[in-house]
A protein has these predicted regions:
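Short, solvent-exposed coil/turn segments at beta-strand boundaries
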Residues: 103-107, 134-142
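Low-complexity, intrinsically disordered terminal/linker segments enriched in charged
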Residues: 144-166
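A solvent-exposed, acidic/Ser-Thr-rich amphipathic alpha-helical stretch
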Residues: 53-106
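A short hydrophobic beta-strand element
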Residues: 104-116
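Hydrophobic/aromatic beta-strand elements that line small-molecule binding cavities or substrate pockets
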Residues: 81, 95-101, 114, 129-135, ...
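Short, cysteine-centered beta-strand-loop-beta hairpins and adjacent loop/turn segments enriched
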Residues: 90-91, 115-127
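Short hydrophobic/aromatic-rich beta-strand segments that constitute the beta-sheet cores
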Residues: 66, 110, 144-145
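Short, low-complexity N-terminal intrinsically disordered segments enriched in polar/charged residues
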Residues: 1-58, 163-166
Length: 166
């Protein structure tokens, strides 16, 4: 696996062509190297932040499936997923904090932070964290997105002596 720092889990340099190293350029099809998968996720978020729905759609396979396990919602297909994002209420901005890609499994994960403001000017911005899992086809297009939106909560009492808060 490779993260956005460009260091491969096995210690190889990205783009290496060693046939013994799974997930490198020589053991995957074009468009599914770790760098290509990371690039696809970066392009997805860059386009979403810019509200460039044409570029956003270009990262998606026609049959993309979007899952939200916490609300048990599923969106099937590129057109519906584009509309879902275009029509999302309020204003939001995304910060990509980390992308990890696995070319051999044609999958990636991203951790993001969102700043969300409501439709009303007096509403205070809300900071949210999210974790996203992506799957890809052989061309490097996104075939699946699963989003988790964990909510912060106070820890249980009795472990203050073991932890530090941030």
């Amino acid at each position: 696996m490779t993260d956005t720092t460009g260091v491969t889990a096995g210690g190889a340099t990205p783009g290496t062509t060693s046939s013994t190293m799974p997930g490198t350029a020589s053991s995957t099809t074009p468009g599914t190297t770790t760098a290509a998968l990371r690039g696809a996720v970066e392009a997805y978020w860059t386009a979403a932040e810019a509200r460039d729905w044409s570029a956003f759609g270009a990262t998606l396979a026609e049959g993309v499936v979007y899952d939200l396990p916490q609300t048990r919602e599923r969106i099937l297909g590129k057109e519906r997923y584009l509309r879902f994002n275009q029509e999302y209420p309020g204003d939001w901005h995304v910060r990509v904090e980390r992308i990890v890609a696995d070319a051999e499994g044609r999958q990636a994960a991203a951790r993001t932070g969102f700043t969300v403001t409501g439709d009303q000017p007096e509403e205070q911005p809300q900071e949210l964290d999210a974790i996203h899992f992506f799957t890809f086809d052989e061309e490097g297009l996104i075939t699946g997105v699963t989003d988790f939106w964990p909510e912060s909560y106070e820890p249980p009492a009795g472990r203050e002596h073991l932890v530090e808060r941030y």
